[in-house]
Curated annotation (Swiss-Prot):
PROSITE patterns: THYX. PANTHER family: FLAVIN-DEPENDENT THYMIDYLATE SYNTHASE. The gene is thyX. FAD binds at residues 64, 87-89, 95, 183-185, 189. This is Flavin-dependent thymidylate synthase. Homotetramer. InterPro entries: Thymidylate_synthase_ThyX, Thymidylate_synthase_ThyX_sf.
């Protein structure tokens, strides 16, 4: 087995827009076909009436017109983030395979902004800052165990053990990469539960790492569909 990369520890999650067919006008012409049939004029120039229609659809939760806008993202994040992401069975996923390639030694470690201490019972808890001693211990242990696991992974592969078996030794903070294709309606559902906002009609308490991922996705989507995003915000971030 051939390994060319030294171990790397990161505290970042990266999101890149690969391609899209997503605009506010997609919502408008998809909705208006209901009443105008084949006479719908497709244009990227929105009138005030068009913007009002988007707001109406969002408020009244007429969701299907929002399904005609699609985005594909390339995301690099630790495996535990992807396991939460894929609970949303409303997107298409293809992930880097540990069966078919050697996995790179890139590991996630929390930065110092990460709150470490859980206070309260499940369903009614909050997180507070940890001490410098707690943070130091966490990082020391994570790095030590990550390196030990990866060394074992390499030894298993060198002994002829299959990738799909050897990978079982690797920890959840290992980075992976996946492509996600999702429509705007499904994306709003994802954002409604994976972000925490003061104006949300239904408050959510996402894990910090998946919220970082969601924040980056939302910023990209907002640039593609600003009027749809504004309507989403106005209606308390409830998916239609």
């Amino acid at each position: 087995m051939f390994f060319v990369m030294d171990p790397v520890f990161l505290s970042e999650i990266t999101v890149e827009l690969v391609k899209h067919s997503a605009s506010d006008s997609d919502v408008v012409f998809s909705a208006r076909v209901s009443t105008l049939g084949s006479f719908v004029a497709v244009t990227d120039c929105l009138s005030n009436r068009d913007i009002g229609l988007i707001t109406f659809l969002m408020r009244e939760r007429h969701g299907s017109p929002f399904e005609h806008s699609h985005m594909t993202f390339r995301i690099s994040a630790p495996i535990f983030v992807f396991r939460e992401f894929m609970r949303h069975r409303i997107a298409s996923y293809n992930e880097e395979s540990g069966r078919y390639k050697n996995l790179d030694p890139v590991f996630y470690i929390p930065d110092e902004k990460r709150k470490l201490v859980q206070i309260g019972a499940p369903g009614a808890y909050k997180f507070e800052e940890g001490t410098s001693e707690q943070y130091g211990l966490l990082i020391e242990e994570m790095k030590e165990l990550s390196l030990a696991a990866y060394d074992t992974y390499k030894r298993l592969l060198a002994c002829g053990i299959a990738r799909e078996v050897a990978r079982m030794i690797l920890p959840l903070n290992l980075y992976s990469t996946m492509y996600v294709t999702i429509n705007a309606r499904s994306l709003m559902n994802f954002l409604s539960v994976r972000t925490s906002r003061a104006n949300s009609a239904f408050h959510s308490y996402p894990q910090r790492e998946i919220e970082l991922c969601a924040d980056r996705i939302e910023e990209i989507w907002k640039g593609l569909m600003p009027e749809t995003h504004a309507a989403f915000e106005k209606q308390g971030r409830v998916a239609p």
